[in-house]
């Protein structure tokens, strides 16, 4: 159940539940790139899985990866569950509650309704082309940099995100498991957190509440 602000790691916890119950005024999103990181708690995996299950992307996981690259790369947020639907931050089967006081009740109600028919979800798997989709992501970054939409360290962060969403070091089409995506997320997160530029961004956010461009 979410209410108010559910972004970054908080959203990663919520979105990997079987269902979410969200208050109408909830704000959701994966905003890690703004502080020099990539989602490292399953956010990349979960959002990619949601997109590849869309009928339009069943046969082309690369296109789903591009969609997710843009959503996470821009740090897109949705200020209501309705606005979150097209980004797949909230799903059609999730429950939206208008009255905040009903949030916990509706959550228990949903749990009880799932008891009799619950089935373990299918394990995510992804088929990504490797170098081909990674090069597409790199071209997006080059284009944004040439238009002065992103600068300096933004590109480095984008390259790490591209590495996660293209399947890492694989240059050929590769089938990836849920655990593979978790591992790639963690590797990129650890590399980025060691950079003083990431730490500068985190410090600025904590001390001023604002992002810096470095």
Task: Locate each region found by the language model.
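Metal-dependent DNA phosphodiester-chemistry modules and their immediately adjacent helices/loops
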Residues: 25, 37, 47, 132-135
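Glycine-rich phosphate-binding loop at the start of an alpha helix
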Residues: 8, 41, 78
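Intrinsically disordered, low-complexity segments enriched in small/flexible residues
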Residues: 49-80, 86, 92, 97-214
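Glycine-rich beta-to-alpha active-site loop
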Residues: 1-35
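Active-site capping/gating regions of soluble enzymes
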Residues: 13-19, 28, 68, 81, ...
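Acyl-CoA/ACP chain-elongation machinery
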Residues: 34-42
């Amino acid at each position: 159940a979410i209410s108010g602000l559910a972004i970054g790691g908080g959203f990663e916890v919520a979105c990997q539940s079987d269902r979410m119950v969200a208050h109408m005024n909830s704000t959701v999103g994966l905003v890690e790139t703004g502080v020099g990181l990539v989602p490292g708690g399953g956010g990349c995996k979960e959002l990619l899985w949601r997109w590849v299950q869309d009928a339009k992307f069943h046969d082309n996981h690369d296109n789903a990866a591009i969609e997710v690259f843009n959503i996470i790369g821009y740090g897109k947020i949705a200020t209501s569950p309705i606005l979150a639907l097209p980004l797949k931050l909230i799903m059609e089967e999730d429950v939206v509650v208008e009255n905040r006081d009903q949030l916990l009740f509706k959550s228990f109600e949903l749990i009880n309704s799932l008891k009799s028919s619950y089935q373990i979800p299918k394990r995510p798997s992804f088929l990504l082309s490797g170098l081909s989709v990674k090069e597409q992501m790199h071209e997006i970054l080059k284009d944004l940099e040439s238009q002065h939409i992103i600068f300096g360290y933004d590109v480095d962060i984008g390259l790490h995100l591209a590495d996660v969403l293209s399947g890492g070091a694989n240059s050929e089409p590769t089938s990836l498991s849920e655990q593979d995506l978790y591992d790639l997320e963690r590797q990129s997160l650890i590399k980025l957190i060691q950079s003083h530029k990431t730490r500068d961004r985190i410090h600025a956010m904590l001390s001023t509440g604002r992002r810096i461009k470095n």
